[in-house]
Amino acid sequence: RKVWCASSTHNTEENFIGLVHKKLKTKYNNLLTIIIPRHINRIYEIENQLKQLGLKTHLHEPNKKISDETDIYLVNAYGQTKSFFAISKNVFLGGSLINHGGQNPLEAARYGCNILHGPNISNFDEIYKFLNSQKISFKVQKQSGMLKILNKLLSSKKNNKKDIRNKIYSKGKKV
């Protein structure tokens, strides 16, 4: 099953992700999108928004299996991010489509994930410049941009997690 993750999302970003999921699902009918909101107290609001888009959601329960029909897996617990980065090749980092300044991309990069982000990344500008230069992160502003990049990444047979980790560790040794 194709899996990708949206982490540290903020209000309005989950709806954006839901719409992207719907469009990607026309090509990848078994796609699973994992959403880890920045503020888990919003989980039921997010779930309702996604259901209004016609998406099937599943709230995170560690020992409960999800169905093949699940579109969006909603994580409502802190400290789970690394588990989902480990199984996702591609991660969108929230707080970047809104005027928040973005989220730290180093954890996702350390797990070898391709990173998608919006234009508002001023809190971590220098790190994103490096990641963009290495083709580890990709800036998106609109659904069409995210669809184009995710489609390319999801259709790739190459698993470049090791390559990404090596680039990060190599840069870390130089610092």
Regions found by a protein language model. Give the residues of each.
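Nucleotide-activated sugar donor-binding and catalytic core shared by glycosyltransferases
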Residues: 1-175
